[in-house]
């Protein structure tokens, strides 16, 4: 080492100095105005003798003062470039085999210092070289320090990096929070939408709350109204109960009066259950609908007889209807009649010799004891047949009638009262306005006594009498009208009490003459029950003739016979033309057996209700179920067409009814009667009525309760006609139609079933059914009924 120092150290130094000089000159030209050299020149004397431990903090402080990250990087790059230049300057040192030593370094520094201070130019270049050398050393030391303690630089860099990253993150976050104008507008729109929805929700809640309040208030109001209504109903019920008690008290008083006035003769009025819809009691009473002695009668006058107070009070108290009150009145009058004929029921009354007798009266007297007189009471057991016109006048019952044993032989019995009657029976009703009621023929013997055999026997006898009458009429054809008036004697002509009454009866002949037909039949109001087709009508009432379906009329002044009766015109064919029944349709074929089944299960069911049941069943049936009946209909139609090739159906027009001057159809009339009955029921007691047993002269008791509404009766009825199947009303209308009565062909009164007999008749005569196109031509219309 010493040898090296001894051997030409300056030569090397000179060579190196020349190289350094050239290098510095070129560097000065390149960098020109580099400020780093000038800035570091004053530090050289101080830093030259300082140890490395003092130089590192100085460098660190210098680096820390640089706040900009880019300036730090640029300075590092410049230091690296200077380091490269210095490496070329001191490359000779790296060629030595010995490591660089500190003493050698110091010696070199001394040499360089001495050389540098030689001239100003060299001094300037030496200072720059020294600075570069120091920088290189510092970089080497920093590299070693970083390797020894890497956290130092990481701390330095991480602090600045973290600050920058924090600044970047904060700005981004602020940008996201602040947002763009579009996002802000969208958010504002969403907020406004939410506010609007909240406002609408609030309004809905308020409205629902108000509705709940209103609903609660309305419910409270309804409850209050219901409570008020219930209270009013209770008060009304209490008033009605009070009225019922008062009426019951009045009834009790009337019953006491009846008991006090017990000297009145008993009434022979059979009482029947109201649901049978019969007027048998009415017929029995009306046979005694007579006038007291001394009271004359003119056809245009009303009955001048007033009710007997005690009897009528008893009837009103017992719940009788207006018709039944009229019947009671008739029976009471009959019981008060006193005549010689009443005491001799088995012998004919002698002719009245007072006054002159017309030839008609003489002929009638000659036939006074004819067997024809037996017909009346037997035919009276049959219902009226309104669909046909009689061929003969209807005689009344004679005292010698074989059916007289059907009734008790009592002095006050209404059946025996025709013997003492001075008023004509239904035949007179067809001859003059002042006739008695034609309900005389509606007496229902089976309903009275339940003896159907007796009724059938009477029917057969009536047929025989009818044949005998026809034979006698054929013998008396030259006498004309005299033959038609053969039964006048039986109407009480010989029982007239004075000549004035006889004269009135004789004057009935011209009236009959004006209304008689050429074929020996009377006017349209006369019905002959002695004909087989008329008598067979009794079988139409469910086999027992328990339900009468005929019309009756009250005799009033100013009403003619034609107005007070049902009459029909011919349907385009002569009276002698035979009636051809229509073939049954499918419904009739099916209903034939079904109706029988229903009647077997419910014998008392009304025909209209049965028809409704059958109609609803038929509509509910399927076409497959109806097919066999349609086939049967086709077969029957084919047979009918072969039998009657020229048959043409001629329907009769609908019946009409005149009420208070208005022309009503039957359905309208029924509705009117219903409303009138309903109005009447509102004024009278409704409920259980006391039973009044009626005892006849022979001790026969007819128990039963009269449950019909009571009313104040009047003997003068203001209208002309009604139906026995409906409850009687004070105003009884006129039944009128535009077709005549049939002359032949058996028909059924009403539309009732025949208990297995003559179903074909029943179905042909079925008028009320919707399938009425297949009903019979000679059917009897269903009686006017509100039931």
Swiss-Prot record:
Residues 352-361, 398-420, 712-740 have a biased composition (Polar residues). It comes from the Eukaryota. Residues 1-46, 340-429, 712-787 are annotated as: Disordered. Residues 184-262 form a coiled coil. It is found in: Nucleus; Cytoplasm. Pfam families: HMG_box. Sumoylation inhibits the transcriptional activity. InterPro entries: HMG_box_dom (IPR009071), HMG_box_dom_sf (IPR036910), SOX/SOX-like_TF (IPR051356). GO terms for cellular component: cytoplasm; nucleus. Its main location: nucleus. Transcription factor that plays a key role in several developmental processes, including neurogenesis, chondrocytes differentiation and cartilage formation. Specifically binds the 5'-AACAAT-3' DNA motif present in enhancers and super-enhancers and promotes expression of genes important for chondrogenesis. Required for overt chondrogenesis when condensed prechondrocytes differentiate into early stage chondrocytes: SOX5 and SOX6 cooperatively bind with SOX9 on active enhancers and super-enhancers associated with cartilage-specific genes, and thereby potentiate SOX9's ability to transactivate. Homodimer. Interacts with DAZAP2. May interact with CENPK. This is Transcription factor SOX-6. It comes from Pongo abelii.
């Amino acid at each position: 080492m010493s040898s090296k120092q001894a051997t030409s150290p300056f030569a090397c130094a000179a060579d190196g100095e020349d190289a350094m000089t050239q290098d510095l000159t070129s560097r000065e030209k390149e960098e020109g105005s580099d400020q780093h050299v000038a800035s570091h020149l004053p530090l050289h004397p101080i830093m030259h003798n300082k140890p490395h431990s003092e130089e590192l903090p100085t460098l660190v402080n210098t680096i820390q003062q640089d706040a900009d990250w880019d300036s730090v990087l640029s300075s590092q790059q410049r230091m690296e470039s200077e380091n490269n230049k210095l490496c070329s300057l001191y490359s000779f040192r790296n060629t030595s085999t010995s490591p660089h030593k500190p003493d050698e370094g110091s010696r070199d520094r001394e040499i360089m210092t001495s050389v540098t201070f030689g001239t100003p130019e060299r001094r300037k270049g030496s200072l720059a070289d020294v600075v570069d050398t120091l920088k290189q050393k510092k970089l080497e030391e920093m590299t070693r320090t970083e390797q020894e303690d890497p956290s130092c630089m990481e701390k330095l860099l991480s602090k600045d990096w973290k600050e920058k990253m924090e600044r970047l993150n904060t700005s981004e976050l602020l940008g996201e929070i602040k947002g763009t104008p579009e996002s802000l507008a969208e958010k504002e729109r969403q907020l406004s939408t939410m506010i609007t929805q909240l406002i609408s929700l609030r309004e809905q809640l308020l409205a629902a709350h108000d509705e709940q309040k209103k609903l609660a208030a309305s419910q409270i109001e309804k409850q209050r109204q219901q409570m008020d209504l219930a209270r009013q109903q209770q008060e009304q019920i209490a008033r009605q109960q009070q009225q019922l008690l008062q009426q019951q008290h009045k009834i009790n008083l009337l019953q006491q009066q009846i008991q006090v006035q017990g000297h009145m003769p008993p009434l022979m009025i059979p009482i029947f259950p109201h649901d049978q819809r019969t007027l048998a009691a009415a017929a029995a009473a009306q046979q005694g609908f007579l006038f007291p002695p001394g009271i004359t009668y003119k056809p245009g006058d009303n009955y001048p007889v007033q009710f007997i107070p005690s009897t009528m009070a008893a009837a009103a108290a017992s719940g009788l209807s207006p018709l039944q009150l009229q019947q009671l009145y008739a029976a009471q009058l009959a019981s008060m009649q006193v005549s010689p004929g009443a005491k001799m029921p088995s012998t004919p009354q002698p002719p009245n010799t007072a006054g002159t007798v017309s030839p008609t009266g003489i002929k009638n007297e000659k036939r006074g004891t004819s067997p024809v007189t037996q017909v009346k009471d037997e035919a009276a057991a049959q219902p009226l047949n309104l669909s046909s016109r009689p061929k003969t006048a209807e005689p009344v019952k004679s005292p010698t009638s074989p059916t007289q044993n059907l009734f008790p032989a009592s002095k006050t019995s209404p059946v025996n009262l025709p013997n003492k009657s001075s008023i004509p029976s239904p035949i007179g009703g067809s001859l003059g306005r002042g006739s008695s009621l034609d309900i005389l023929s509606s007496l229902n013997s089976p309903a009275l006594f339940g003896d159907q055999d007796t009724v059938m026997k009477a029917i057969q006898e009536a047929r025989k009498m009818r044949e005998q009458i026809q034979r006698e009429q054929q013998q008396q054809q030259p006498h004309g009208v005299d033959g038609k008036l053969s039964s006048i004697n039986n109407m009480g002509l010989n029982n007239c009490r004075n000549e004035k009454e006889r004269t009135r009866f004789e004057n009935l002949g011209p009236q009959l003459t004006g209304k008689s037909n050429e074929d020996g039949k009377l006017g349209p109001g006369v019905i002959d029950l002695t004909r087989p087709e008329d008598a067979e009508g009794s079988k139409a009432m469910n086999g027992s003739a328990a339900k009468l379906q005929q019309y009756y009329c009250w005799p009033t002044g100013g009403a003619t016979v034609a107005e007070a009766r049902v009459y029909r015109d011919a349907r385009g064919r002569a009276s002698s033309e035979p009636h051809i029944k229509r073939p049954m349709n499918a419904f009739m074929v099916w209903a034939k057996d079904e109706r029988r089944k229903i009647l077997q299960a419910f014998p008392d069911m009304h025909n209209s209700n049965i028809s409704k049941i059958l109609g609803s069943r038929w509509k509910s049936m399927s076409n497959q179920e109806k097919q066999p009946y349609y086939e049967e209909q086709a077969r029957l139609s084919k047979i009918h067409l072969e039998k009657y090739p020229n048959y043409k159906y001629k329907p009769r027009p609908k019946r009409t009814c005149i009420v208070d001057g208005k022309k009503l159809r039957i359905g309208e009339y029924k509705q009117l009667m219903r409303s009138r009955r309903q109005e009447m029921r509102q004024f009278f007691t409704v409920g259980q009525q006391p039973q009044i047993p009626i005892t006849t002269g022979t001790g026969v008791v007819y128990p039963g309760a009269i449950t019909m509404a009571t009313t104040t009766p009047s003997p003068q009825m203001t209208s002309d006609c009604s139906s026995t199947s409906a409850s009687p009303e004070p105003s009884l209308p006129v039944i009128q139609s535009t077709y005549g009565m049939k002359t032949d062909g058996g028909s059924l009164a009403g539309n009732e079933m025949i208990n297995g007999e003559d179903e074909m008749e029943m179905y042909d005569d079925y008028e009320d059914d919707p399938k009425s196109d297949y009903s019979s031509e000679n059917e009897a219309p269903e009686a006017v009924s509100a039931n």
